[in-house]
Amino acid sequence: MNNNIEHQIADYLLDDENVIMAFTFIRDSIVLTNYGIYTLDVQGISGKKVEVKFFPGKNIKSISFESASTFDLDVDIKISVDGNTAINQNGIPYNAPISFKVPKKQAEEAREIVKLVKMHYLSR
């Protein structure tokens, strides 16, 4: 695992929580553990502000992968989860997916995330 990611989530991991795999795409990261999924959203110009979110494995409902077309620069991953509440333009709350844009050159890593999410959270 990337040492920077490991450092950023070390304080959040439980004693018996193990990292399955971690991925970084541009500045943001996703970390899969035996307990669930962490997302690290790097914010600001300096990148010193990082929002860490955790989604328990039991809240993960589905995953989608959208491939890049000829003119796209990235592929999209969306993980549907309960508890990631957002408000739409009409003021109505909904469960927003965890959403990542992945550079086309890292598409294989994105496919690996799909496999790991299915294996560890959706096949139980």
Where would I find each of the regions flagged by the language model?
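Conserved beta-hairpin
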Residues: 21-49
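Hydrophobic alpha-helical segments
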Residues: 47, 70-72, 117
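Canonical pleckstrin homology
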Residues: 66-112, 123
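Intrinsically disordered, low-complexity boundary segments flanking structured domains
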Residues: 5-11, 51, 65-66, 86-88
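Acidic Ser/Thr/Pro-rich low-complexity disordered segments
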Residues: 38, 43-51, 84-95
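Anionic N-terminal interaction surfaces
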Residues: 1-32, 94-96, 103-113
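Phosphoinositide-dependent membrane-docking surfaces
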Residues: 37-38, 50-68, 78-82
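Long, non-globular regulatory segments flanking folded domains
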Residues: 118-124
